[in-house]
Amino acid sequence: MSSPTTSSLDTPLPGNGPPQPGAPSSSPTVKEEGPEPWPGGPDPDVPGTDEASSACSTDWVIPDPEEEPERKRKKGPAPKMLGHELCRVCGDKASGFHYNVLSCEGCKGFFRRSVVRGGARRYACRGGGTCQMDAFMRRKCQQCRLRKCKEAGMREQCVLSEEQIRKKKIRKQQQESQSQSQSPVGPQGSSSSASGPGASPGGSEAGSQGSGEGEGVQLTAAQELMIQQLVAAQLQCNKRSFSDQPKVTPWPLGADPQSRDARQQRFAHFTELAIISVQEIVDFAKQVPGFLQLGREDQIALLKASTIEIMLLETARRYNHETECITFLKDFTYSKDDFHRAGLQVEFINPIFEFSRAMRRLGLDDAEYALLIAINIFSADRPNVQEPGRVEALQQPYVEALLSYTRIKRPQDQLRFPRMLMKLVSLRTLSSVHSEQVFALRLQDKKLPPLLSEIWDVHE
């Protein structure tokens, strides 16, 4: 059974309603290029953090000796990475997120020294400021290296001064001594400000002050309103999706599971669910503050690149660890075998479930999911983005809101925020695996509906 006629992605962006059937496709073709994917599948839990960086740097790996000369490295297992990730500045092997960018230890230290010591005023390029940066040239031209750091997204406001580092260490030592004198010997209880999924984003938890790292942190009125709007928009879009449930091709029951008709029906069933998800994401994006301020081309570019990643986030959100199944639209529940019967490859199915399990361990609530999705949408490094600076500026309030929210919700878990951002790196990996899956479907002569073909740039 064929899937229902769907609309072009190009049609719904400026308006306020869901895509309309029969609309012509006129969106620009997106080249299959962009940021180099990070191979290796979903990321493990991040084992350490760098106290010398501010929280917005999400600098969670090897501490820089020059930032904390008296600090001894902690013993234990080395931080695990996703694979052979590359530094976004010089192309060397990356060690983690530093100052908001996946980068190597060398570029991390260089950027910090440049900011703290005012190196930008002293650097000069002999080649007119056009040097191509790599692991060799990074030592030859400091001006172009600093320029590339900023172009990659490193933020000066994430760098702490020596005085700030010293005060932060003193404050932490005082907190630790107070904790030891007040707490009885034994396992530490859970924080009263921590809560499970579904916590109210604007209630007492988000608006109250925490302890430890969360002490003094409070959401602004604008941040509380932003979170409430995002959560409400997601709920509204989700309810609209339920109304499309009767339109989905039924999952074949009782028929020969290996018959051609049954295989086609299962494939149609999954593609129609994907169409509903895409329409829900487009509808949600239009309600994200700032999205409709962008030009039409950038709206399309951001949606084309982020849709599959948001779909995977929503898939993880619906994962049931007890049954190891994923539920869509309340009534459709699927196991790994069901995904395989629908024509998906094990190489794509297994990472989906691994990612879903990792997300469940984080225990995100509705507000955190909504903020993470908004951050994902406003990714300035997507292919064909015309105004990356504007996109990055729109993303920043959501990053800051998520940082504050997580520090209030789980003040004792300093790694929660960087772990969330690392999940966005995992999504880039899954996105590249998805591209391979789409190519495999084409080899099987399985034709995708027009909307999915357009948004995933499948050209027959």
Swiss-Prot record:
It is found in: Nucleus. The keyword Transcription regulation applies. There is a cross-link at K409, K447 (Glycyl lysine isopeptide (Lys-Gly) (interchain with G-Cter in SUMO2)). Ubiquitous. InterPro entries: Liver_X_rcpt, NHR-like_dom_sf, Nucl_hrmn_rcpt_lig-bd, Nuclear_hormone_rcpt_NR1, Nuclear_hrmn_rcpt, Znf_hrmn_rcpt, Znf_NHR/GATA. GO terms for biological process: cell differentiation; cholesterol homeostasis; hormone-mediated signaling pathway; intracellular receptor signaling pathway; mRNA transcription by RNA polymerase II; negative regulation of cholesterol storage; negative regulation of cold-induced thermogenesis; negative regulation of DNA-templated transcription. Its main location: nucleus. Keywords: Activator, DNA-binding, Isopeptide bond, Metal-binding, Nucleus, Receptor, Transcription, Transcription regulation, Ubl conjugation, Zinc, Zinc-finger. One of its GO terms (molecular function) is DNA-binding transcription activator activity, RNA polymerase II-specific. This is Oxysterols receptor LXR-beta.
